[in-house]
């Protein structure tokens, strides 16, 4: 069972599936809940988020496996967003998901169970890094904070350069083809360190994602020479 990432679809696995099938596996790659033409949930910013709880996504994975007449799968493979769902599948139902492969996004493990909350109620704490990023000489914001804002969805769907060119620039900016990509470990979770990340991760505070990646749009010659994500793929 192959679970795709964001912003992707099951189509992302089209080059992987034949190789696995040739090895003798029945390969299944669904569009995950909230992606593609899936239904039964609200895309409205104020919509109910309960349908997207992880256990519901695990149930979706199990439902797909069972729908194809299998009681278990050899492996559940998750990439990016799918790498969040896949380990929970394996943890929740190891009898169904016999092994797990996690790609791109590391699994942080199961959260600690709150203890002695009757005497010491848990308090919601704010991560100061967002405030610190905004206070930098060059004000910044974390991309996940931006994605959680009301305007983000419309910003990307209505990108001035068009959705196709937005995604072309977005993927180019994140790929090894972008010459300024230089992966290296940060010294800590601080605004000063996070500001060293490329702008697709830590954006300028007053820019949308469409504006951010437009600055890194590859040339027509670069696009024509691209073999990782060609337009005719």
List each language-model region with its residue ranges.
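Conserved HGGG/HGGXW glycine-rich cap/lid loop of the alpha/beta-hydrolase fold
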Residues: 1-43, 64-66, 79-84, 92
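Flexible "cap/lid" subdomain of the alpha/beta-hydrolase fold that forms the substrate-access gate
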Residues: 35-77, 83-233
């Amino acid at each position: 069972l192959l679970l795709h990432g964001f912003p992707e679809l099951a189509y992302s696995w089209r080059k992987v599936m034949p190789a696995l099938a040739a090895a003798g596996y029945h390969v299944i790659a669904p569009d995950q809940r909230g992606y593609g033409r899936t239904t039964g949930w609200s895309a409205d910013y104020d919509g109910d988020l309960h349908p997207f709880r992880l256990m519901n996504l695990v149930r979706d994975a199990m439902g797909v496996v069972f729908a194809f007449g299998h009681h278990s799968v050899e492996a559940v493979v998750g990439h990016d967003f799918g790498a969040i769902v896949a380990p929970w599948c394996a943890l929740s139902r190891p009898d169904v998901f016999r092994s797990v492969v996690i790609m791109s996004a590391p699994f942080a493990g199961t959260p600690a169970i709150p203890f002695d909350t009757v005497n010491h109620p848990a308090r919601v704490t704010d991560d100061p890094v967002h405030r610190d990023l905004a206070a930098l000489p060059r004000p910044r914001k974390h991309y996940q904070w931006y994605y959680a804002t009301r305007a983000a969805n419309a910003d990307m769907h209505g990108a001035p350069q068009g959705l196709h060119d937005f995604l072309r620039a977005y993927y180019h900016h994140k790929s090894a083809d972008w010459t300024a990509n230089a992966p290296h470990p940060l010294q800590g979770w601080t605004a000063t360190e996070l500001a060293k990340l490329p702008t697709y991760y830590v954006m300028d505070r007053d820019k949308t994602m469409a504006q951010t990646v437009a600055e890194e749009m590859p040339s027509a010659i670069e696009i024509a020479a691209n073999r990782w994500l060609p337009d005719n793929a």
